[in-house]
Amino acid sequence: MLAFARVTLTPQLPARQRMEIITMIKGRIHSLESFGAVDGPGIRYLIFLKGCNMRCQYCHNVDTWNPDTDNLMTADELLDKAERFRSYWGKEGGITVSGGEALLQIDFLIDLFRKAHERGINTNLDTSGQPFTREEPFFSKFNELLKYTDLVMLDIKHIDDEEHKKLTGHTNKNILDCARYLSEQGIPMWIRHVLVPGITDNDEYLKKTREFIDTLDTVMNCLLYTSPSPRDS
């Protein structure tokens, strides 16, 4: 999922050269948008990454599923582009990274968000939480990422695990665990949920979704979206 410089890392390399290798991590980029008004607080510069494990039946970014792309960019290249539009952001705006599933490129995300904070740029992670696990090495990397994350927009596809599997092809257990962990760590969250006729708009499911959200301490907003019936598989 990542591109690295083709240099053999040996103890004999000067420290500066070793640092240059580390900072040459490149993200697989799907697309960029300069003016996002509904993707976090304020006006956001949007970075869509390639690759997603889930196969949501109502997905409107199907072309981001495949991780393959020739569009590779470093964190500094992206931030240089983003800062051209900084005058629009005001006090609340910044960058939002989405996908695809951004957490599949967590090493790149850490580099991007760390450098964004060094430039005083607000960071927002838009994720389904599907890659989340408390197992290593992901868990340590996730905690490192949170040091530079100002907001997480977490998309809960379905509160019922079996229905979630039908809808996305994956369990929701680690996604709900991700929400709990973010709350435990004091990370501000916006919860997103899509109302799909006949699938997620059931009163019982909505009640359970609300009950789960009520157990979280750091939810600032809940955003409901509507979608037509899912496409034929």
Model regions and ranges:
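Acidic, Ala/Val/Gly-enriched low-complexity intrinsically disordered segments
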Residues: A3-V7, A15, E20
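Conserved small/polar residues in nucleotide/adenosyl-binding loops
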Residues: Y225-D232
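Conserved AdoMet/S-adenosylmethionine-binding subsite of the radical SAM
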Residues: E83-F85, K91-G94, G99, L103-L223
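N-terminal [4Fe-4S]-dependent radical SAM core
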Residues: E20-F48, M54-N71, R84-K91
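Short connector loops/turns at beta-strand edges and beta->alpha or beta->beta junctions
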Residues: C52-M54, K157-I159, S227
